[in-house]
């Protein structure tokens, strides 16, 4: 019996699949996501305000 690599590798080709990246808050980063890198940490754009506030002490205010 011939061993099929698709069956052996759980139907995935490990050589052509990209590694999944995880941002600072544990969210998966896909190739189409917008993100920033700060000191080696990946932060998704939707988590950026939270990161700036919690990690860097930024204060966001409204001009009123």
From Swiss-Prot:
InterPro entries: Uncharacterised_Yqai, YqaI_dom_sf. This is Uncharacterized protein YqaI. The gene is yqaI.
């Amino acid at each position: 019996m011939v061993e099929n690599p698709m069956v052996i590798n759980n139907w995935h080709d490990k050589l052509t699949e990209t590694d999944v990246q995880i941002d600072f808050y544990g969210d998966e980063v896909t190739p189409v996501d917008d993100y920033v890198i700060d000191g080696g940490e990946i932060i998704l754009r939707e988590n950026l305000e939270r990161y700036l506030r919690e990690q860097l002490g930024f204060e966001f205010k409204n001009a009123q």
